[in-house]
């Protein structure tokens, strides 16, 4: 079980031929996937080469908090009886 027999290699070759060879739809799809991966990698490398100039961060602003008026208790507003 450690090594692959001749039949295993024939099956692997047939699958690769179906995926990447010929003029079928599957080979076109695989080619498009490969182009997409290449352009993705190219975009990542371009981002690494040209870092954007970091603009200075604005200092944190403090918010003026107004004290909340004390709310009346429920027992004072809703009396039964």
Swiss-Prot record:
<feature type="region of interest" description="Disordered">
    <location>
        <begin position="41"/>
        <end position="81"/>
    </location>
</feature>
<dbReference type="InterPro" id="IPR003369">
    <property type="entry name" value="TatA/B/E"/>
</dbReference>
<keyword id="KW-0997">Cell inner membrane</keyword>
<dbReference type="GO" id="GO:0043953">
    <property type="term" value="P:protein transport by the Tat complex"/>
</dbReference>
<keyword id="KW-1133">Transmembrane helix</keyword>
<comment type="similarity">
    <text>Belongs to the TatA/E family.</text>
</comment>
<keyword id="KW-1003">Cell membrane</keyword>
<dbReference type="Pfam" id="PF02416">
    <property type="entry name" value="TatA_B_E"/>
</dbReference>
<keyword id="KW-0813">Transport</keyword>
<protein>
    <recommendedName>
        <fullName>Sec-independent protein translocase protein TatA</fullName>
    </recommendedName>
</protein>
<keyword id="KW-0811">Translocation</keyword>
<keyword id="KW-0653">Protein transport</keyword>
<dbReference type="InterPro" id="IPR006312">
    <property type="entry name" value="TatA/E"/>
</dbReference>
<dbReference type="GO" id="GO:0008320">
    <property type="term" value="F:protein transmembrane transporter activity"/>
</dbReference>
<feature type="transmembrane region" description="Helical">
    <location>
        <begin position="1"/>
        <end position="21"/>
    </location>
</feature>
<dbReference type="GO" id="GO:0033281">
    <property type="term" value="C:TAT protein transport complex"/>
</dbReference>
<keyword id="KW-0472">Membrane</keyword>
<keyword id="KW-0812">Transmembrane</keyword>
<comment type="function">
    <text>Part of the twin-arginine translocation (Tat) system that transports large folded proteins containing a characteristic twin-arginine motif in their signal peptide across membranes. TatA could form the protein-conducting channel of the Tat system.</text>
</comment>
<comment type="subunit">
    <text>The Tat system comprises two distinct complexes: a TatABC complex, containing multiple copies of TatA, TatB and TatC subunits, and a separate TatA complex, containing only TatA subunits. Substrates initially bind to the TatABC complex, which probably triggers association of the separate TatA complex to form the active translocon.</text>
</comment>
């Amino acid at each position: 079980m450690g090594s692959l027999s001749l039949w295993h290699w024939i099956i692997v070759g047939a699958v690769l031929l179906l995926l990447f060879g010929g003029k079928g739809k599957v080979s076109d799809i695989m080619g498009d996937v490969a182009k997409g991966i290449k352009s993705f990698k190219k975009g990542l490398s371009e981002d690494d080469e040209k870092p954007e100039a970091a603009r200075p961060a604005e200092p944190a602003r403090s918010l003026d908090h107004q004290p909340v008026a004390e709310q009346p208790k429920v027992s004072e507003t809703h009396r039964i009886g």
